[in-house]
Amino acid sequence: MTRAGLSPLAWLDEVADQRRAAGLRRALRTRPAGGTAVDLASNDYLGLSTHPRVVEGAVRAVREWGAGSTGSRLVTGNTELHEGFERALAAFTGAESALVFSSGYTANLGAVVALSGPGSLLVSDALTHASLVDACRLSRARVVVTPHRDVTAIETALATRDEQRAIVVTDSVFSADGVLAPLRDMHDVCRRHGALLIVDEAHGLGVRGTGGRGLLDEVGLAGAPDVVMTTTLSKALGSQGGVVLGPLAVRDHLIDAARPFIFDTGLAPAAVGAAWAALEVLVDEPSRARAVLDNAAALAQACDVPARPDSAVVSVILGEPEVALAAAIACLEQGLRVGCFRPPTVPAGTSRLRLTARASLTDDDLDTARRVLADVLTAARR
């Protein structure tokens, strides 16, 4: 039987129609330079992506090292800039060492896959970030997905395993709703059962902990020998890239075994220079971390969300995807840019507006947010 004449991509139209009918079609929307909309959608938590010192850090790095890193860090892409920033970030977070990757996504892939593998067990929270989910899938380890924030289920998985090596992976702050992971309890369980804990601090760095050092710092686990921290440079630090922090033995192993590190071009100097400058601003101005949480509380109050947020994220669940998308568009039309999360990013029936507070929000910005959200949410909740 032949299938000559069949288009190998014809199925894409059918899938696109199904997504459109379910209200789940995505579209790219251009963000204008210097736009006037109040930004409650970006992850620029500390408002550092446009900070003069951060911009100058990027420019200075380009002038000294060039526009690109020119190769893998194992060939020509490793510079004094990369290693100096790694030392600075490790010192800031209390880790023994750090290794920079080209993105937070590849940092998670590299760490989880290289530290697990066949014959090991990975225990993952049901709501971990997609990069951790994909890392578990690629690891060839046995994977147990536990209910959200369920420490008892984690302990059961570890206690009943046959594998010698076991790793528990989690976000510190879950990105869709801003809820904190019970890191101290999770670490206690890991310690009892000889498991490694890998924590993605993408939404914790710059917001939680002393001066924004992260949730691991806040719960007393900074630099713990059985904890590996991953994070992005694209949120609180306003740049781009990712990093894995932990014991020196972990760094050495990743240089040998993490494929996203070995076979990827090193992070561009501009991104490293910007992230390093942002880190220096955070060290000089630790109050920025507190400002994020204070502004998140103001946004939660504007949305009638009863609890004070634990992070920069304020989640307003509206239910169906069409309702959430219409609300996000209505906000933008009134000068307020908000996030809109729909399945498969969040479970069916929980489509939502996702607001992210930033340290740089002004009183006028918050007044605009209160006015627009009151109008839009009243209509959306009818």
Swiss-Prot record:
It catalyses: 6-carboxyhexanoyl-[ACP] + L-alanine + H(+) = (8S)-8-amino-7-oxononanoate + holo-[ACP] + CO2. GO terms for biological process: biotin biosynthetic process. Pyridoxal 5'-phosphate binds at residues 104-105, 175, 200-203, 232-235. InterPro entries: Aminotrans_II_pyridoxalP_BS (IPR001917), Aminotransferase_I/II_large (IPR004839), AON_synthase_class-II (IPR050087), PyrdxlP-dep_Trfase (IPR015424), PyrdxlP-dep_Trfase_major (IPR015421), PyrdxlP-dep_Trfase_small (IPR015422). Pathway: Cofactor biosynthesis; biotin biosynthesis. Its cofactor is pyridoxal 5'-phosphate. Substrate binds at residues 26, 129, 345. Keywords: Acyltransferase, Biotin biosynthesis, Pyridoxal phosphate, Transferase. It comes from the Bacteria. This is 8-amino-7-oxononanoate synthase. It comes from Mycobacterium sp. (strain KMS). The lineage of its organism: Bacteria, Bacillati, Actinomycetota, Actinomycetes, Mycobacteriales.
